[in-house]
């Protein structure tokens, strides 16, 4: 421990707050909260805790701390700081940890939607749901049974669901409320009423010799019973709560969540994390702050935590966070723990192997480039069609893993003398001019898809901004396969195709290429539509964009029936559109 850190530790008060450990390069590597900052920070250096803590402690070179009024404020501040700085030794909720929900919107004409974001102000949510494929089948089944609005257009226009009696033209507001009530009962596992309705419809169809619909109603009954029963485990009571179980071994932590609704297990989710802090209470609390900040929360959360953290979480989310108190809750918590152990034993070998491969790749790259850290890598690729419709894509690797939430798309300017060189200058300038002006953290490394031309363009842009960020290019061979690292001095390092580093960089280059190409394809489709349908009288921007949502090509548009297109267009505009399409 250096003298500066020793002196700072002596001055820390016995008050609640957050502490930020920094390494020798002034990078924040871990953020924690404490009821007593002095006791908590000193505990890291009071003898060797274990391997996981020693790895963190060995990298500590400096400290910052922020004093707050109470533990609840510290909890909120810690969560915000972790989201801002993304420290390498903190538990970070993985990208894609927003679990799926089935949602009924609170619009005048409600729609049933399958979503991965939770916003209680937008409607009624059912979930979170496990096994996305099976639950999407449930979504489609519910949409076929109940007459929720299927369209985005005005309610007075007929749509393709009109003849199926699933159109807003044929549904009263009272019917929507009945449908919502039925869906609520289904997610409680109460199928008797809806099955009786479907059976009645089936019998009525048979009486009318309408065997096609009779078969449909019979299949709906079978599918509904199968999907619901396969996904729900019945308890012997009628409670709604979440159970949090966790298991720690060999510097890894498994956290498992059971979501019970009205006595039925609706979802089971599990995550595995490498950990570097000995205080499990703090790690679990940090995870729960992140998880419930972006997922639906139950009215009761049962988790084995100390009283201070339970109280802080309860105050933060205005719901009950409690230890298991009854025999029933203890039995379910034991079940969650058993599941966490089983998950650890069945998955940990694969998790460790993947993490070791990732660590090896990052260490090799750090060694080659002589860089201390690679927490954040930003990778760029430009794309265009004969220098028209130029775009750029940027993907972000956080601690070696792709974080899709941080990816960005750029529409680039076209000029008379535009080239790939100028496009790269533009996107690098726009990205880092913004980060600097907003005082945001710069990446540890920039990777550009390309050779010397692209590297020199990026270097020029950074020089104009007067900032210095390590930079490399990834060059491909004649077969369009990743081949070599291009350094800023023009030297190339040919990659061994059997190495872990090659696999890591090739995946990165493919990821950014696919991201950019996908964006270009969407833009190109829109451009073709725009040029071919230009000057169609009455087809304004709003109607044009609505058509793009449903038709991927001019051929799709040509084959659409008038009845379909009248959902989006007045009759006179449809006539004008048909005249234009017939000339193409």
Swiss-Prot record:
A Gene Ontology cellular-component term: excinuclease repair complex
Domain (GIY-YIG): residue spans on this chain: 14-91
UniProt xrefs under HAMAP family: UvrC
Domain of life: Bacteria
Function: The UvrABC repair system catalyzes the recognition and processing of DNA lesions. UvrC both incises the 5' and 3' sides of the lesion. The N-terminal half is responsible for the 3' incision and the C-terminal half is responsible for the 5' incision.
Pfam families in the record: GIY-YIG, UvrC_RNaseH, UvrC_RNaseH_dom
InterPro entries (alphabetical): ConA-like_dom_sf, GIY-YIG_endonuc, GIY-YIG_endonuc_sf, GIY-YIG_UvrC_Cho, RuvA_2-like, UvrABC_protein_C, UvrC, UvrC_RNase_H_dom
Protein name as annotated: UvrABC system protein C
Cited PANTHER family: UVRABC SYSTEM PROTEIN C, UVRC/OXIDOREDUCTASE
Assigned keywords, A-Z: Cytoplasm, DNA damage, DNA excision, DNA repair, Excision nuclease, SOS response
SMART domains: GIYc (SM00465)
Main location: cytoplasm
Protein family per UniProt: Belongs to the UvrC family.
Residue ranges of every copy of the UVR domain listed in the record: 192-227
Subunit structure: Interacts with UvrB in an incision complex.
An MF annotation (GO) of this entry: DNA binding
UniProt subcellular location: Cytoplasm
Swiss-Prot/TrEMBL GO biological process terms: nucleotide-excision repair; SOS response
SUPFAM superfamilies according to UniProt: Concanavalin A-like lectins/glucanases, GIY-YIG endonuclease, RuvA domain 2-like
Originating gene: uvrC
């Amino acid at each position: 421990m250096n003298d500066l850190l020793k002196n700072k530790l002596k001055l820390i008060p016995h008050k609640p707050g957050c502490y930020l450990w920094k390494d020798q390069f002034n990078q924040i590597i871990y953020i924690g909260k404490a009821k007593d900052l002095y006791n908590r920070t000193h505990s890291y250096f009071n003898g060797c805790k274990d391997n996981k803590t020693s790895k963190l402690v060995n990298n500590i070179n400096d400290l910052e701390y922020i004093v707050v009024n109470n533990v609840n404020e510290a909890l909120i501040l810690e969560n915000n700081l972790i989201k801002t700085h993304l420290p390498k030794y903190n538990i970070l909720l993985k990208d894609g940890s927003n679990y799926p929900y089935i949602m009924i919107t609170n619009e005048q004409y409600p729609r049933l939607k399958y979503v991965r974001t939770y916003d209680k102000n937008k409607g009624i949510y059912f979930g979170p749901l496990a096994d996305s494929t099976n639950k999407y089948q449930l979504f489609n089944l519910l949409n076929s049974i109940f007459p929720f609005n299927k369209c985005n257009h005005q309610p007075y226009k007929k749509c393709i669901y009109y003849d199926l009696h699933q159109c807003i033209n044929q549904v009263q507001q009272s019917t929507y409320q009945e449908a919502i009530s039925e869906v609520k009962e289904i997610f409680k596992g109460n199928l008797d009423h809806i099955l009786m309705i479907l059976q009645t419809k089936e019998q009525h169809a048979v009486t009318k010799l309408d065997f096609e619909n009779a078969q449909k109603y019979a299949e709906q009954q079978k599918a509904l019973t199968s999907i619901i029963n396969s996904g729900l485990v019945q308890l012997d009571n009628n409670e709604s709560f979440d159970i949090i179980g966790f298991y720690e071994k060999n510097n890894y932590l498994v956290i498992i969540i059971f979501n019970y609704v009205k006595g039925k297990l609706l979802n089971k989710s599990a995550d595995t994390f490498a950990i570097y802090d000995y205080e499990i209470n703090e790690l679990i609390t940090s995870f729960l702050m992140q998880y419930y900040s972006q997922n639906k929360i139950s009215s009761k959360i049962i988790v084995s935590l100390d009283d201070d953290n339970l109280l802080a979480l309860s105050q933060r989310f205005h719901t009950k966070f409690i230890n298991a108190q009854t025999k029933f809750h203890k039995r379910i918590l034991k079940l969650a723990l058993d599941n966490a152990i089983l998950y650890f034993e069945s998955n940990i070998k694969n998790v460790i192997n993947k993490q070791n491969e990732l660590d090896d790749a990052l260490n090799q790259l750090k060694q080659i480039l002589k860089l201390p850290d690679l927490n954040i890598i930003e990778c760029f690729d430009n794309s265009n069609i004969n220098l028209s419709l130029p775009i750029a894509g940027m993907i972000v690797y956080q601690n070696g893993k792709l974080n899709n939430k941080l990816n960005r798309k750029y529409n680039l300017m076209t000029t008379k003398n535009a080239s790939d060189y100028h496009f790269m200058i533009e996107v690098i300038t726009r990205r880092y001019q913004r980060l600097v002006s907003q005082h945001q953290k710069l990446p540890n490394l920039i990777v550009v898809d390309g050779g010397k031309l692209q590297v020199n363009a990026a270097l020029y842009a950074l020089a104009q901004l007067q900032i210095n960020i390590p930079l490399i290019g990834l060059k491909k061979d004649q077969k369009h396969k990743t081949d070599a690292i291009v350094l800023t001095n023009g030297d190339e390092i040919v990659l061994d195709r059997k190495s872990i580093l090659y696999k890591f960089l090739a995946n990165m280059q493919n990821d950014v290429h696919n991201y950019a190409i996908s964006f270009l394809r969407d833009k190109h489709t829109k451009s073709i539509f725009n040029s071919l349908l230009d000057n169609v009288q009455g087809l304004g921007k709003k109607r044009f964009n609505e058509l793009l949502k449903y038709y991927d090509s001019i051929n799709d548009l040509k084959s659409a029936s008038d009845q379909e297109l009248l959902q989006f267009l007045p009759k006179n505009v449809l006539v004008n559109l048909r005249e234009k399409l017939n000339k193409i």
